Amino acid sequence: MPIRPLSVLTALLHVYIALRLLPALATLTPAWPLALVLLVVSAVTMPLPFVSRSHRADRKAKPAGETLHWIGLISMGWFSSLFILTLVRDLGLLLAWLASALGGLQVPDTVAPWSALAVLALATGVSLIGFFNARRTAGVKQVEVPIRGLPAALDGFTIAQLSDIHVGPTIRNGYIQRIVDAVNGLGADAIAITGDLVDGSVPELRDHIAPLAGLRARHGTFVVTGNHEYYAGAHAWIDELRRLGLKVLLNEHVVLQTRNVRGAQTDEELFESALVLAGVTDFTAGHFDAAHASDPHLALYDAPPLVHTRVLLAHQPRSAPVAAAAGYQLQLSGHTHGGQFFPWNLFVPMQQPFTAGLHRLHDMWIYVSRGTGYWGPPKRFGAPSEITLVTLVPAQS
């Protein structure tokens, strides 16, 4: 949406909230002037992230652009909660009015002002907590995935999953370094980054993504593209990530040998301790580049048939039905952020088959990460960020 229509829409939404809250707060001094100031500041600053894009190419203006982004995104997060809570309040007042008109229920005069104050307080409180949750280093979430027929050599194999970091205007070098330090402390066998790593071009973000070169795992770090890589120039980012030593999987796979098989006499001996780790491009990648159309079947092309443990990295959960049909035992995904903050988690199922956590689809498991960073407003509430440590274990018969 162009900046001008977006600014008009933002202004109209602020007018709606002002009309619904300010009259009710008139009897609560100093709540009324405080609410007015907050609404004015929000209305003025919310469009700033879009305006600040024009500063990105100008190095002298870069600090100003980053400041505008921070202010605007914080306002956006606060207003998002304020808007939803105002709608909920209006629905509650409507139901109370109907109960009064039809059933004779007496609604105290204090309900309107105090409910308006509660909306303001809750939106502010949720935003403050959400800001802290978003800016802290993601916690480690341990997940065991039971795999039928898992070879003994793969029992306990670990994959550290990062997803949806969204390096950009508010996620910078220091934030990434903290993630790298946390992941390296896990001692995982492999590291998987399941897309939406960046929100900007290579020249803008090269320095901030550089710490990823320090990721350490026995079998290396593997990356698949998300939709945001295509917004930011996927081909340039693929080259940059490979320059950093990360292995980008574009509808392809690698075979990971988990122990020394030197001297193996048969194919069974050669592959009994192996794992196929495949990766596909983003579910929507074909809209940006036909050659990048996502294909879980193609990712298994020429995979050793005797290696039955097959793990797929796919940014969006929507890849799961085709992945299950292709014969994978596990798909690791992200994209949803778990909704990031209430109530948006309620809307994720409208677009994705799974929102967060471990799920079963036919004979395949799918794990959906809530994401390691955040997108847009620096705010997480009810959907904590995570570094996921996935451990493969034998399924109980």
Pin down the residues of each PLM region.
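Soluble catalytic domains of enzymes that build or remodel membrane lipids, polysaccharides, and related
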Residues: 141, 146-397
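Non-catalytic terminal accessory segments
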Residues: 1-136
